[in-house]
Curated annotation (Swiss-Prot):
<dbReference type="Pfam" id="PF20741">
    <property type="entry name" value="GKRP-like_C"/>
</dbReference>
<comment type="similarity">
    <text>Belongs to the GCKR-like family. MurNAc-6-P etherase subfamily.</text>
</comment>
<dbReference type="GO" id="GO:0046348">
    <property type="term" value="P:amino sugar catabolic process"/>
</dbReference>
<comment type="function">
    <text>Specifically catalyzes the cleavage of the D-lactyl ether substituent of MurNAc 6-phosphate, producing GlcNAc 6-phosphate and D-lactate.</text>
</comment>
<comment type="subunit">
    <text>Homodimer.</text>
</comment>
<feature type="active site" description="Proton donor">
    <location>
        <position position="85"/>
    </location>
</feature>
<dbReference type="GO" id="GO:0016803">
    <property type="term" value="F:ether hydrolase activity"/>
</dbReference>
<dbReference type="InterPro" id="IPR040190">
    <property type="entry name" value="MURQ/GCKR"/>
</dbReference>
<feature type="active site">
    <location>
        <position position="116"/>
    </location>
</feature>
<feature type="domain" description="SIS">
    <location>
        <begin position="57"/>
        <end position="220"/>
    </location>
</feature>
<dbReference type="InterPro" id="IPR005488">
    <property type="entry name" value="Etherase_MurQ"/>
</dbReference>
<dbReference type="InterPro" id="IPR046348">
    <property type="entry name" value="SIS_dom_sf"/>
</dbReference>
<dbReference type="Pfam" id="PF22645">
    <property type="entry name" value="GKRP_SIS_N"/>
</dbReference>
<comment type="pathway">
    <text>Amino-sugar metabolism; N-acetylmuramate degradation.</text>
</comment>
<dbReference type="InterPro" id="IPR001347">
    <property type="entry name" value="SIS_dom"/>
</dbReference>
<dbReference type="GO" id="GO:0097173">
    <property type="term" value="P:N-acetylmuramic acid catabolic process"/>
</dbReference>
<keyword id="KW-0119">Carbohydrate metabolism</keyword>
């Protein structure tokens, strides 16, 4: 009798890599690259499902809701990674998008024995951050069957939070525990069962779509520029000056002065140059337009 994972797409052997142990270096990387090409096509097939989850999540965010990713192992690490990039890129509070990994942050570097097999641990973790009905919990599990994720989704459903699930198998168990589910079928891994590869890449690409779309909808992007970037190092300071200069048809020197005068707030600096008003007035304009720079510029008195 086979094991409970035998029929999962993520556990099947890949016929294209069965002899990878005797391949040359060039053959190995060509095989990996060939398999990786399939990922974007797999995601393309589930774009309607991704869209539904994004729109439903954004509706929750309008009422103060947060986005919480939960997962174990690679899936958990990817959630933490995506969440941690939101504050520096879009200037949002670190609590708005959070990643929770089974076993805690120590598990980012070293797996914690038994954490992913617990049906109750995620509930405790979600209680710790005071999960509420305005929030969205998105469970990540390449195999679609991680108990930690299932337990977390069940608790989120219980308190009325929105739930989503991302997996890489058909008819995933976690899909049955979420209102919205995404099953990106990338096929067997080059190394059997190594879901840090194609499945992990697929999950990261989907998370990129989710977080980026949400931030765009929140007005954190002007055209395709990250106007809420936090200028916390030399590279980001230069990027901020360039964004301000480009959006206001100003010189880099004028942009630099406005950035300093605004207290390193890119959107405020942009409005200061466009309206010739002071920092306080421009902050008020932004506040009147929900912090959305596009709306603020359209509604400049």
């Amino acid at each position: 009798m086979g094991s409970i994972i035998d029929n999962l797409e993520t556990e099947k052997r890949n016929i294209n890599s069965e002899n990878i142990d005797i391949m040359s270096t060039c053959e190995i990387i060509k095989t990996i690259n060939s398999e990786d090409k399939k990922i974007a096509y797999a995601i393309e097939k589930v774009i309607p499902e991704i869209e539904k989850l994004i729109d439903a999540t954004y509706e929750k965010m309008l009422f103060g809701g947060r986005v919480i990713y939960i997962g174990a192992g690679t899936s958990g690490r990817l959630g933490v990674l995506d969440a941690s990039e939101c504050p520096p890129t879009y200037g949002v509070d670190a609590s708005l998008v959070q990643g929770i990994i089974a076993g805690g942050y120590g598990a980012l570097l070293k797996a914690k024995e038994g954490a992913e097999d617990s049906l109750t641990l995620a509930k405790e973790d979600l209680k710790e951050i005071k999960l509420n009905s305005h929030d969205t919990v998105i469970g990540l599990a390449a195999s679609g069957r991680t108990p930690y994720v299932i337990g977390g989704l069940d608790y989120a459903n219980e308190i009325g939070a929105l739930t989503g699930a991302i997996s890489c198998v058909n008819n995933a168990q976690i899909s049955q525990h979420a209102k919205y589910f995404i099953e990106a079928i990338v096929g067997a891994e080059v190394i059997t069962g190594s879901t840090r590869m194609k499945a992990g890449t697929a999950q990261k690409m989907i998370l990129n779509m989710i977080s980026t779309s949400l931030m765009i909808k929140k007005g954190k992007v002007y055209h395709n520029l990250m106007v809420d970037v936090q200028p916390t190092n030399k590279k980001l300071i230069e990027r901020s000056k360039n964004i301000i200069a480009e959006c206001t048809n100003s010189s880099v020197e004028e942009a630099e002065k406005a950035l300093i005068d605004s207290g390193n707030q890119v959107k405020v600096a942009m409005l200061m140059l466009l309206t010739k008003k002071d920092k306080k007035s421009c902050i008020n304009i932004l506040n009147e337009n929900d912090g959305n720079i596009s709306k603020s510029i359209r509604n400049i008195p």
